[in-house]
A protein has these predicted regions:
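Hydrophobic beta-strand-centered segment that forms part of the acyl-chain substrate-binding groove
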Residues: 32-77, 81-83
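A conserved, well-ordered hydrophobic junction motif at loop->secondary-structure transitions
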Residues: 12-23
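HotDog/MaoC-like acyl-thioester-processing domains
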Residues: 1, 59, 63-68, 76-159
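Short amphipathic
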Residues: 1-7
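Short helix-to-loop capping/linker segments positioned immediately adjacent to catalytic or ligand/cofactor-binding
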Residues: 9-13, 59-61
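A broad, structural micro-motif
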Residues: 16, 50-52, 98
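GIY-YIG nuclease signature motif recognition
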Residues: 25, 73, 113
């Protein structure tokens, strides 16, 4: 998915605000869902959708107003009800990695508001996407935990 940093996305530090990275990645997820057949039509007809239940974002380099970006998606894992994806945001002209996002989504029956299995047609599309990425490997940025290496204070500390 391609986009451009809108001027209203710029914060007091004169770079793209964190909230808009999430927005851009969310739009990237929508593009990925379309490849699987999870469209507005699917949501309306099936009364099913996806809910994000966990995410982790890393910021690598700043983006400024009007700069173009490219978001790519990689499937990390899936099962009959869940999908774990990883996205990268690159500067579309200079090629540098600006940010990454890792998300876990659930397939949900909207009427029951409960997790539900993927329909076979969607699961088949997810499987085909995964097969095309078998050689991609696990991204270095995926599965990270927030950490202060040598904290002065830590709530985890048992001194």
């Amino acid at each position: 998915m391609r986009g451009s940093v809108l001027p209203e996305w710029i914060d007091v530090n004169n770079h793209m605000n964190v909230a808009y990275y999430i927005l851009a990645f969310d739009q990237g997820v929508d593009c990925l869902w379309e490849q699987f057949g999870i469209t507005q039509h699917y949501i309306n007809v099936s009364d099913s959708s996806t809910f994000a239940v966990e995410s982790h974002v890393t910021w690598q380099r700043e983006l400024s107003a009007d700069e173009p970006y490219l978001i790519t998606a990689q499937l990390l894992a899936y099962d009959e009800k869940r999908i774990h994806q990883f996205m990268r945001m690159y500067h579309a002209e200079h090629g540098f990695l600006a940010a990454t996002a890792e998300w876990l989504n659930l397939h949900v029956d909207l009427g029951a508001r409960k997790v539900a299995p993927w329909p076979d047609a969607i699961l088949s599309q997810i499987a085909q996407f995964a097969e095309r990425q078998e050689d991609c490997g696990w991204p270095a940025e995926a599965g990270k935990q927030i950490n202060v290496p040598k904290p002065i204070y830590s709530a985890m500390r048992k001194d």
